[in-house]
Amino acid sequence: MAQSLAVQGGSAVRTRPWPVWPRPAAGAAEAVQQVLSSGRWSISGPYRGAASQERRFARAFAEYNGVAHCVPAASGTASLMLALEACGVGAGDEVIVPGLSWVASGSTVLGVNAVPVFCDVDPRTLCLDPEAVEAAVTERTKAIVVVHLYSAVADMDALTALAERHSLPLIEDCAQAHGAAYRGVKVGALATAGTFSMQHSKMLTSGEGGAVITRDADFARRVEHLRADGRVLAGQRPGPGEMELVETGELMGNNRCLSEFQAALLTEQLKDLDAQHAIRRRNAALLDGLLRESGYVPQETSEGTSTRTHYTYAVRLPEGRLTHVGLATVARALSAELGCTVAPSYAPITRNRLYDPASRRRFALGVEHQALTDPKRFELPVAEDAARRVLTLHHAALLGAEDDMRDIAAAFGKVLRHGADLTA
């Protein structure tokens, strides 16, 4: 029984616990406690004579990314919607997005009454394929959103050139790529704007949260209006007890603000980010080599990537192996061997059960709009292949030791050797 699969009652490769995520920074508890007693828990709270935690984080994150402006927001989804609206995207416009991503890549476009146009991805990087984007541009296209997926950075040379050629804004969705860089420039700073998620699983997290970064002051001002009910931060210090937010009447918005608790936590977590990246990067490189020995194919990143980060470790099954059972069965077997979750890649958004515009009355904007937003009209063969063959592992596992990587490789090797025993 020692060599039989754990999912079938055999001994698991590993029974020791894995690193826990999130991992609070040294100053996190004190920072949150200071907010508790500060008398100001949100950006709309009364000014108390010192910069808000929201402003402190905004400055720190802008500096980290090498840009002039950062507008924190309530979530990654909110950040994407803010960026889209700040680009002028609205009713009936088309926005090109990758077909392989989290559902927010499509739902945020729907949320601004626009039409998501799903494009296929590069088979090596699993990021937006520039050739597919070129073929999808029409006179109705108003923006392109590129997602730096899993552990890869997209081909930004090709995508920025394409966007410039068609005079289209390019938004970088960096929810899975905090700190990555392309030709020496941080992701998010390469295009019109960059958006980030600070949700629980992310490499920089406050449980929930987000941010929009940009080099453009006018763009940042539009985002500020959109995320704070049409208000922006005052240009001068307010009096005690007054709000820092002022009403301008320039642009209507909604409340998508980050709380002071989240901002304080993010400022502290940011201090640990690069050190954690270094650990993940070293372990991912080791794991790449170990898994290649068994025929697995790790996800690649684009040639221009100068700093790689690893949100999700993604690896493709060896060619022609384990094809007799679904990927979910393989993932369950690996999870049983390791005592942590190994998951199949995202399904293409076009057939993700969580993405169903027809289930929401707010998107019933006429026969033509409903036809255009029907996800079944798109064919995404590369994304479909990834959903059949790519396995993923959360970055927390990469914060372990070298022996942990060897355990992962041993589990992948064991499941491959005993794959014939698996049944769907």
UniProtKB/Swiss-Prot annotation:
One of its GO terms (biological process) is polysaccharide biosynthetic process. GO terms for molecular function: pyridoxal phosphate binding; transaminase activity. Catalyzes the PLP-dependent transamination of 2-deoxy-scyllo-inosose (2-DOI) to form 2-deoxy-scyllo-inosamine (2-DOIA) using L-glutamine as the amino donor. Also catalyzes the transamination of 3-amino-2,3-dideoxy-scyllo-inosose (keto-2-DOIA) into 2-deoxystreptamine (2-DOS). The modification N6-(pyridoxal phosphate)lysine is found at residue 202. It holds the Pfam family DegT_DnrJ_EryC1. Pathway: Metabolic intermediate biosynthesis; 2-deoxystreptamine biosynthesis; 2-deoxystreptamine from D-glucose 6-phosphate: step 2/4; Antibiotic biosynthesis; lividomycin biosynthesis. Its EC number is 2.6.1.100, 2.6.1.101. InterPro entries: DegT/StrS_aminotransferase, PyrdxlP-dep_Trfase, PyrdxlP-dep_Trfase_major, PyrdxlP-dep_Trfase_small. It comes from Streptomyces lividus. This is L-glutamine:2-deoxy-scyllo-inosose aminotransferase. Its cofactor is pyridoxal 5'-phosphate. The gene is livS. It catalyses: 2-deoxy-L-scyllo-inosose + L-glutamine = 2-deoxy-scyllo-inosamine + 2-oxoglutaramate; 3-amino-2,3-dideoxy-scyllo-inosose + L-glutamine = 2-deoxystreptamine + 2-oxoglutaramate. The keyword Iron does not apply. Belongs to the DegT/DnrJ/EryC1 family. L-glutamine:2-deoxy-scyllo-inosose/scyllo-inosose aminotransferase subfamily. PANTHER family: DTDP-4-AMINO-4,6-DIDEOXYGALACTOSE TRANSAMINASE, TRANSAMINASE.
